[in-house]
Structure formats: structure tokens, C-alpha cells
Amino acid sequence: MICPRCKNQDSQYFYTFKNITYCRKCVKIGSTCFSPSRSPSIIKTVDYQLDYELTPLQNNISRQLLQRYQQHLNTSLKAVCGAGKTEITYEVIKYALNQGQRVCFTTPRKELVIELAKRLQSQFKNISITTVYGGHSELVDGQFIICTTHQLYRYPQYFDLLILDELDAFPYVNNEVLIGLLQNSIKGNYIYMSATLTNQPDLLMTKRYHGYLLDVPKCYLTSALVMYLWAIKKIRDFVRKKKPVLVYVPTIQLTNTVARIFKLFKLKSHAISSNTKDIQKFIERFRHHQLDVLVTTTILERGITIDNVQVIILYGNNRIYTTATLIQICGRVGRKTAHPSGSISIFTPYKTRAIKECLKTIKQDNA
């Protein structure tokens, strides 16, 4: 027996009650009572508008994505943080929508979905984008859907084009149920994208859109006490220069502790984690310089772009900081043309293998 949703074949997860068989591996994701419309979509004249021109490299990759989709090929794309990988999917999205096909842009985390939906809805014309995530699922039908990977259970064999951004992000990575739900939602072809793919990609972008190199982090080998004193000194220097600071810590409990410590030194700080309600509100306050510092877990390792932001990583030896996580965190810096570089500081008692691999990878991408 194979579960039609998550593709589970392990018999211990199947349970039959009143002649109905359930898969306990994916039943907690949600019921299957909703059936999206299967009627053919009306062909539209969908277009998009950017306030900037794509670089020659972006245009080249964009054309290749479109050509591969027209040839019914799946594609994996590795693009360094800040390469502008979202924008290079617009041509293939436009093509699919104008063919009357159904398109999904999916990513593992709700915060990324909210950011993406706001951005794409302002750039795409003549199409209403349906946004679906936990707590926001009143409307789930549509031709162009942006959703978390958890919500794909609603769409069996539904999408002609599915774009998965950050496929190596928690909670999707190594999650057999979510992987199965995603595969089951595709009836056409997919594009998988990330800055930290481990397998050889079909397409590769090693340069940021503005042409500047990736910032290489500096490691400070120090004890916890000295770490805090050094970090506070750095943050004060940044604040004087009106530079916002993202401080990463490995646990939720530490976000609150560190934010309180910073407040003792008259720094306007706030803690962000998966427990935080209305994360976007605090990100906007941070973006508009109403906060000096956001102390965050790895929930903000991806998908956040703040102009002129500086990054500090505390307790860099913690196991939560994998090579991929560190590369993504470092990629928060220098994403805007006005401020294409910045400071990344890792405070740790010693260099872990992940830190060494992060440094090696960034230097190789810059070569």
C-alpha cells in the first residue's frame, strides 16, 4: 500500500477504521476535504514590472529556466545569497500563467511566504495571487498560489509548475512527509532553488546581482563573558553609524536573555523566535530604525533583507549552526546596491567544522 499524499509505504503507519484506511504519517498535516477547482484556467495576459533591470547573468539564467520548462525538464538552481534568484523565475512564471497553467511558489517557512506574497503581488499584473499558510487559509484556490510546503496537502496533482525556494530549510529538509506531499502536488515540472545545495545543480549563479563579492565572516575565539563585552562594543559602534544589527543566538531562551542584556546598555532591542507573535511587525520596526538590534534564532537565517544590516553570531560553536545555516546567515549582509558589503562576526570558543566549511565555501564562491 502507498499513501496517495505523502507516498509512505511503511505498513505500521496505516490504520483502518470503518473500512477507511488512514496514513498516520501525514494525517496530522490536515484533512483532504478540500478539493481545488479542476476546471481549465482562463488564459490571461499576465505580466510583471520591475523597478530595475536584470543583470546579463540573471537574464541568461532566466532564459535557461524558461527553455528547460518548455522542454518539460525539471531544474535545480544554486544561487549565492543576494544573487536575485526570485526575480529570475518571473519569466517562466509569466509564461506558464499565460498558457493557462497553474503555478505554485512554495517555501518551508511562513515568514518567507508572507514576504514573497507581498513582493510578487506588487510586481505581477493582471493576476490575483492566493497566499496560503497556517492561520491564513480562507481562500485556497487559484491559478497562482504562494504557500508553505505544509499546505501542499491541499493540492494533489495540481501544479503544472512548482517552484520550491530554500529546499534545504527547516522544516522541509529531510522531512519525508513534506517531501512526499510536494512531489504529489506536481503534475508538470519543478524548479528547486537554494544558495546551499549540496548536489550538483543544473544551473549555477555564483555572483550577486550588484557584482560585489560575498562578505567573509570574521571569527573571534573568546569566552562567553568576553564575547558579550566585545559584541556590545561592536553594536554600539554600529548604532552610532545608524547601522541595524542582527544578532543570532542558538536557542529561544537566549533570545530573551540577550535582548535584556542589550537593553541594560541602552540599546533598543527585541527578541525574535518561533514563539514571537506578529514577527513582521518587529521586522518592519527594525527596517525603519525604530529598533537598533533584533536578537533572533535561526528563524531569520533566510528570506529577510534589511538595508545596511550587520550580523553578529553568538555561541558559534553550537550544533544548530550547520554550514548551510551559517552561509545563509552571512548572506543577510550586503544585499542592497546602496550598501553592498558589511560586517559579519562569529563569536565562538573554537572554529567548528561547520565554520571552517562556511569560510571555505564563501571564499570559493568569491574566486
For each of these PLM feature ranges, what is it?
Residues 2-42:
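Interdomain "pre-motor" coupling segment immediately N-terminal to P-loop NTPase/helicase cores
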Residues 40-43, 197-238:
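Interdomain hinge/linker at the junction between the two RecA-like core domains of SF2 helicases
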Residues 77-86, 96, 101-116, 236-262, ...:
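Conserved strand-helix element at the start of the C-terminal RecA-like helicase core
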Residues 114, 118, 127-140, 270-297:
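Conserved helicase ATPase core of P-loop NTP-dependent helicases/translocases
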Residues 149-192:
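SF2 helicase catalytic motif II
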Residues 159-165, 301-317, 343-346:
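A short beta-strand element within the Helicase C-terminal
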Residues 173-187, 319-341:
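Conserved SF2 helicase motif VI
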Residues 187-199, 207, 330-361:
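Conserved segment of the helicase C-terminal RecA-like domain
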